[in-house]
A protein has these predicted regions:
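Extended, helix-rich architectural segments
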Residues: 1-161, 165-166, 176, 522-525
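An N-terminal domain-start capping segment
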Residues: 43-64, 182-219, 302-316
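Short glycine/proline-rich turn/loop motifs
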Residues: 96, 100, 104, 312-317, ...
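Short amphipathic alpha-helical segments
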Residues: 108-113, 121-129, 260, 264-267, ...
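Short coil/turn segments at secondary-structure boundaries
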Residues: 131-135, 148-150, 280-290, 347-353, ...
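Extended, regular secondary-structure scaffolds
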Residues: 131-250
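Extended, charged amphipathic alpha-helical segments
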Residues: 220-364
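C-terminal helix-loop subdomains that flank or include functional centers
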Residues: 303-310, 321-325, 329-527
């Protein structure tokens, strides 16, 4: 079947005819999935086969066989990693509390919520976890995040499930109502005495079920279960979040970053391999001798042949084949890869003279990459919001005496219903720090922005505490400046103040001393 058959439709005969190598490889991959992953569901078989195909290309296995000896330009991996790292930057993301009804959030409320999220995501290794989330989603098009309560360390662990082992069922086919979620862990048969191949965990809103199995069937009602355990779901919801890599309004599952470039990358590699074969053939030239015997002639550097017949002719086969059309076609394929992936050539290291390039021109050049990053910020951001909400809901069940949680709910009893904790992605686009600070200063002077908004834009973490620290520093600097000014004033103007005090202590002569006679008061004048 062709790649266009992965959505559940019949593969195209024309596609198989044009790409027989890809068809053979896909057939072998499909057989592997059928034997080891899915045995009883054709549609899921197509989905999982697609996931495995994307992963093989990401890992550089672009051929059915002999991948080590064949030339392979792994643009699938380069493009996926570039978009992901462009979104994450150095710090991945920070947290920001947003109210559904208002933009005004108490500083103390935001501080408590951010501290809770920083703790649980930090314990889950946020930076590496963030990369794995975008990696799994970028390759397969879908990523499932699970939230587990770790009793020993009192935190909610966020983890990434392998999309190739995740299976979802819905209520009456409604994608908005997940009925159950099942994740499987492949096992090595040699490592266990019972011959188990899979460990399975299945969640519903009411219960959690775990078991081992020896076959690859996914229908839990018909499969033989070993060491089966079942217990009540303490949360009342399935602690798993599904994130689409790219929006797909036609169904539940998302779109992979490799969806549009995989076939082109495959053809490009095959073409470059053929060009390499032509060049390799002419690197060690073949010597042609006519009209003479080659038995006594030694080929090599510094060898001199003499005594050849006059009609003899000796020459090397040269590269006289015109490869310009092939080279131009390879360039067209390379250009198409960049156009369809929205990753400019400059983003992968192509040298560009940017000394006289304006910031606006650079933004236009990198706009496709920024557009892809913005789409992922939307889809993954909404998924992380759901994960943050689950963390708080699990805390209410597993650790209701949590100090910060109690303070948060005391200040905002309806916090979970009226607020969301959003991620603010760092974005790795090169920035002119001086220009950014000048623009921030101008916005503050014009009173069209706040310090908090500017800090969020710059990717600062723990903004409420940072603002308090800045204000405290400003107050301390003001008090220190006041004390310094007072000390300088006393040092420079202390003598003048002393003279004024002495003048004040000198008795003022009355009019009798000045005129030589006493001025009568009102009573004497009346007399």
């Amino acid at each position: 079947m062709g790649v266009n058959g992965y959505a559940g439709y019949t593969g195209s005969t024309h596609w198989n005819q044009d790409s027989r190598q890809l068809g053979e490889g896909t057939t072998a991959l499909r057989s592997f999935v059928l034997q080891n992953i899915v045995q009883d569901n054709t549609w899921e078989l197509d989905r999982i086969t697609k996931y495995y195909l994307y992963w093989k290309f990401y890992e550089g296995l672009h051929y059915k066989d002999f991948n080590d000896g064949l030339l392979s330009f792994n643009y699938v991996r380069a493009f996926i990693d570039k978009v992901n790292m462009f979104l994450l930057g150095d710090e991945a993301f920070t947290f920001h509390v947003q109210n559904y009804y208002s933009t005004q959030i108490s500083k103390e409320t935001e501080k408590l919520a951010e501290e809770i999220m920083m703790y649980h995501w930090g314990k889950s290794n946020k930076l590496q976890l963030s990369y794995e989330i975008l990696q799994m989603g970028g390759i397969t098009g879908d990523v499932w995040l699970g939230v587990d309560w770790i009793e020993e360390e009192k935190y909610c662990r966020v983890s990434v499930f392998d999309s190739r082992q995740c299976f979802v069922t819905f209520e009456n086919g409604d994608f908005n109502k997940v009925e159950s979620f099942m994740v499987r862990q492949p096992l090595d048969r040699k490592s266990n005495e019972n011959g188990y191949t899979l460990f399975v965990q299945k969640w519903t809103n009411d219960k959690v079920e775990t078991w081992y199995q020896k076959d690859a069937a996914i229908n839990s009602d018909n499969v033989t279960k070993y060491d089966q355990k079942e217990y009540e779901n303490p949360y009342g919801f399935i602690p798993v979040v599904h994130i689409k890599n790219k929006p797909n309004s036609s169904g539940y599952y998302g779109k992979s970053d490799a969806n549009d470039i995989l076939k082109i990358n495959k053809v490009y590699n095959e073409l470059m391999q053929q060009l390499k074969a032509v060049i390799d053939y002419h690197v060690t030239p073949t010597t042609v001798i006519t009209g003479a015997s080659a038995k006594s002639l030694k080929k090599g550097l510094g060898q001199i042949w003499s005594g050849l017949p006059a009609e003899a002719n000796v020459f090397n086969l040269g590269l006289d084949v015109d490869l310009s059309a092939t080279v131009n076609y390879a360039k067209d394929l390379k250009t198409a890869l960049h156009e369809l992936s929205d990753v400019p050539e400059n983003a992968l290291g192509k040298i560009q003279a940017i000394s006289n390039t304006s910031a606006a021109a650079l933004q236009i050049t990198y706009h496709p990459l920024m557009q892809q990053a913005n789409i992922k910020a939307m889809t993954y951001g909404e998924g992380i919001v759901k994960v943050n909400s689950m963390i708080l809901r699990i805390l209410k069940v597993k650790d209701p005496e949590n100090k910060r949680l109690k303070q948060l709910l005391k200040q905002e009893p309806d916090f979970l219903e009226e607020n969301m904790i959003k991620p603010v992605f760092a974005f790795g686009f090169p920035k002119d720090r001086t220009d950014e600070l000048n623009r921030a200063q101008m916005e503050l002077n014009m009173k069209i922005s706040s310090r908090r908004e500017i800090m969020e834009r710059m990717g600062k973490q723990n903004i409420p505490e940072l603002l308090e620290e800045i204000d405290e520093d400003a107050i301390e600097q003001g008090l220190l400046q006041a004390r310094i000014s007072q000390a300088l004033h006393e040092m420079m103007g202390g003598s003048d103040e002393g003279d004024e005090e002495e003048e004040d202590e000198t008795p003022i002569p009355d009019e009798e001393d000045i005129d030589g006679e006493e001025t009568p008061d009102n009573g004497e004048n009346e007399e």
